[in-house]
Amino acid sequence: MNRRNFLSLTGTFTGGALLLPDFLHAFGSQQNLIIGDQCIVFVQLNGGNDGLNTFVPFENPLYYDLRPKIALSKDIVIGKNKGMAFHPALKGFAEMQQNGDLSVIQNVGYPEPNRSHFRSQEIWQTASDSNKYINEGWLGRYLDLQCKDHQPTAGINLDSIDNLSLKGLEPNSITVKNPNVFKTKNQKEEAGVLSDNPQLDFVRKVANSVTEGSDEIQKALAKSTAEISYPKTGLATNLAWIARLIKGNLNSKVYYTSLNGFDTHDNQLAIQNNKLTELNDALYSFYTDLKKASLMQNVTIVVFSEFGRRVKDNGKGTDHGTAAPMFVIGGNNKGKIIGNNPNLSDLDQGDLKYETDFRSVYASLLQKKLDFDYTKIGIQNKALQGLF
């Protein structure tokens, strides 16, 4: 079988309508059909978002001393709280925190940090130590254990490329750029003409999952509409699709999407303002949509980046750093600022020292929102306390 035929059977279409992850092993026995009404939506900020100019230590004079070219004036930051405040583009974030729906987890990172975009994203997506390599994503491992046989829409990635976080041994997730055109011809019929060669059983099962996933997504979309008008941006479009799938009772446990463009080595003030505006407007629309549908208690939104930026500016921008804030919205979180304000006088070779390991946040999400024992997927960090 050539590559073209294999891709047509597994549902990877050149038009970007659907991509399925690569799977490495045969299908094994599974446990426990996914149940429950909670789901988590992950928004990954690719490029390394500058946390210090996102959630700003505006009362710390070192912030202004170390960033003479890019520090944000205390007169323009918003939502001031305990010496910290939001970038002025994040008006929706400030309002969500005022409503008690947004928590900020400060100084999130991991030991022995890696400043490579690719490797640090891989560490976050697999929940590995920085010196270890894992083939499957942390959410993929969770779905493998929680799905009986397979459930092709247990995880949804709104993107044009697969996300390692959702990669598992079973076809329990689907990557789709535009769910509205996620309509395939009868893949089961094509899969049925395969030989009885056991090596092709995997192909047959994945091909059948394409059709099953397509049917489930179309049914969910048919039962829901967009209740509000979203901005005309890529992230907002993705979140609007996710909102419709949630309101249509697709019963996916995890959704994933991303926003590129945060690698601000130069011209940071303008670039980050534009990116944070897109993030704010898209997420606040999503929040408003789900709030109107009385679903925010069922949906937890997690916003993060693979690393922050160095504390001292390089002129008009910043270079790759380490620790940065994470944001958690909805899901009955406690709406708190968790952790100490960034310590700008005690740095690790010019970088912030991490205070909370990102895997402790993952552990809390799995334990509190998905009722899952996080140690079963290899997370040894204790769950973060005080988030939910």
Tell me what each language-model feature is.
Residues 5-26:
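N-terminal export signals
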Residues 71-86, 264-388:
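Feature marks hydrolase-like catalytic cores characterized by long aromatic- and Gly/Pro-rich stretches
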